[in-house]
């Protein structure tokens, strides 16, 4: 599918996010079509959100229950990660499953596209996959994350499946995984660690606007795109 109109992207932040997890996808999407293909909105629960590296990011819009009601207005949701493991910012954020941040992720995954001409995509970057796994988004799906967090992601996936009476997903090591559309028609893509978010984002550009557009974007960024290092599923077959 090659789209002719621009898409609205929501990129959500939490305290302790990884800077490249945010900036990598942001720059890819903003450079695609020289900013013509994607309109990117940054959201967080606080006006200023500080990354694990100390960068202060100002939001465009608040993550609250009102924003959850506006999710049909957005075509793509990007969820960055950060340091995972016991006592980490990712663990603390994932533990609060009723927060607006976590609720927004699950609600986006459940909102069907308004039309086939405007697909919906949920893209996790690095350990942002743990948030999706915790909310059951990866039930019965393949997914990936940073290589050091593969076990953490599998645990979150297994725990969510038990809590929601679903079938656990399968975690695999890869630069990115496109597991196809869920039952609501939302495409679920997860990336490996940090810089792999660039590859997943370029893959997203390719999927929506064509390979030439993705190659032009990679050239503009002077980035060697690992375009064949991902896993793309045909239905639920892994190959």
Describe each model-derived feature in a short phrase.
Residues 2-11, 67-239:
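Active-site-adjacent pocket-lining segments in enzyme domains
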Residues 2-73:
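N-terminal beta1-alpha1 cap of cysteine-dependent amidohydrolase-like domains
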């Amino acid at each position: 599918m090659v789209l002719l109109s621009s898409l609205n992207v929501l990129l959500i932040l939490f305290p302790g996010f990884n800077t490249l997890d945010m900036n990598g996808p942001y720059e890819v999407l903003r450079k695609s079509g020289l900013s013509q293909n994607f309109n990117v909105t940054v959201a967080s629960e606080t006006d200023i959100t500080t990354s694990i590296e100390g960068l202060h990011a100002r939001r465009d819009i608040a993550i609250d229950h009102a924003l959850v009601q506006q999710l049909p207005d957005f075509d793509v949701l990007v969820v960055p990660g950060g340091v995972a493991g016991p006592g980490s910012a990712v663990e603390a954020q994932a533990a609060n499953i009723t927060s607006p941040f976590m609720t927004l992720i699950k609600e986006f995954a459940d909102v069907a596209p308004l039309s086939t001409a405007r697909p919906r995509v949920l893209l996790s970057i690095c350990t942002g996959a743990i948030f999706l796994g915790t909310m059951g988004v990866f039930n019965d799906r393949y997914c990936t994350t940073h290589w050091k967090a593969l076990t953490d992601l599998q645990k979150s996936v297994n725990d969510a499946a038990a809590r929601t009476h679903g079938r656990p997903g399968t975690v695999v090591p890869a630069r990115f995984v496109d597991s196809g559309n869920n039952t609501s028609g939302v495409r679920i893509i997860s990336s490996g660690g940090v810089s792999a978010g660039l590859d997943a984002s370029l893959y997203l550009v390719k999927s929506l606007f064509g390979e030439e557009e993705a190659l032009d974007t990679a050239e503009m960024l002077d980035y060697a795109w690992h375009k064949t290092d991902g896993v793309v599923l045909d239905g639920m077959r892994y190959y």
